[in-house]
């Protein structure tokens, strides 16, 4: 039987330069406090945790009013995270599994307000505000073994020229070592991808093909360098299908002048 020991305590730090410690230039200082109350043993922890972040500098913006709480074990965290910052307000509730072989995610996120321009995440538009509801039920370490579904609903994106809205967007993944499947369904377009090749190889193949057939989109020297180590999909095939419904609102939000006709279809077999 494992020997368990009670543990209880709190810690507080002010102006800790965590970015320097982790060698992450976009991450600055942090001020926070946290507490833990539970039991620990050899390879085991079961405790209630809570805390708050009064200051966190990231990407040139100072966040505040973040708090969290829940139950922490050696393999899971089940609880909530809330933000009430002027640029970021959200309510996260759910569970995350830390199993290194197959982590899982089961959560609901109410993204009440995210000012992407103020947080320096969108430098093109002076107005860039997003809100949405997100449900995720998935597992996997990477895209290659990702299985589950992510649903995004009640999306409102306000930018300089207009406001983009959608009621539902669904991403479904069914992936294993020998089979890849991704499906995206929305009011704007539906897309399906099937393959037996890992995604990294597929992405490299698509990029090298674009550099070959549309060289003006890429730096010539970099393209030649990558072409020397270009990959190919051997004894396999991949299929990408895209059916455009009404994509104009998305195109306007992504890039000025981008136009994709409603009803367009794309079928790629490679």
Feature map (PLM): residue ranges:
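Interface amphipathic segments
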Residues: 1-133, 139-270
């Amino acid at each position: 039987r494992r020997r368990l020991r009670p543990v209880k305590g709190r810690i507080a730090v002010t102006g800790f330069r965590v970015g320097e410690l982790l060698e992450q230039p976009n991450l600055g200082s942090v001020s926070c406090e946290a507490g833990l109350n539970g039991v620990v043993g050899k390879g085991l922890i079961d405790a209630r945790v809570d805390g708050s972040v009064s200051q966190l500098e990231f990407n040139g913006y100072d966040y505040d009013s973040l708090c969290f709480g829940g139950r922490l074990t050696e393999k899971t965290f089940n609880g909530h995270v809330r933000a009430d910052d002027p640029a970021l307000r959200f309510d996260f509730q759910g569970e995350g599994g830390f199993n290194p072989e197959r982590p899982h995610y089961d959560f609901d996120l109410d993204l009440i307000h995210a000012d992407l321009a103020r947080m320096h995440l969108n430098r093109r538009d002076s107005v860039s505000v997003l809100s949405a509801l997100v449900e995720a039920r998935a597992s996997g370490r990477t895209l290659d073994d990702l299985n589950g579904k992510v649903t995004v609903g009640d999306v409102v994106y306000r930018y300089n020229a207009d406001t983009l809205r959608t009621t539902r967007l669904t991403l479904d993944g069914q992936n294993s070592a020998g089979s890849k499947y991704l499906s995206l369904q929305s009011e704007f377009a539906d897309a399906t991808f099937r393959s037996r090749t890992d995604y990294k190889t597929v992405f490299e193949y698509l990029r090298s093909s674009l550099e070959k057939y549309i060289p003006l989109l890429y730096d010539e020297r970099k393209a030649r360098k990558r072409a020397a180590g270009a990959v190919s999909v051997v004894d396999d095939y991949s299929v990408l299908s895209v059916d455009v419904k009404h994509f104009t609102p998305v195109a306007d939000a992504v890039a000025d002048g981008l136009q994709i006709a409603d009803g367009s279809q794309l079928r790629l077999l490679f």
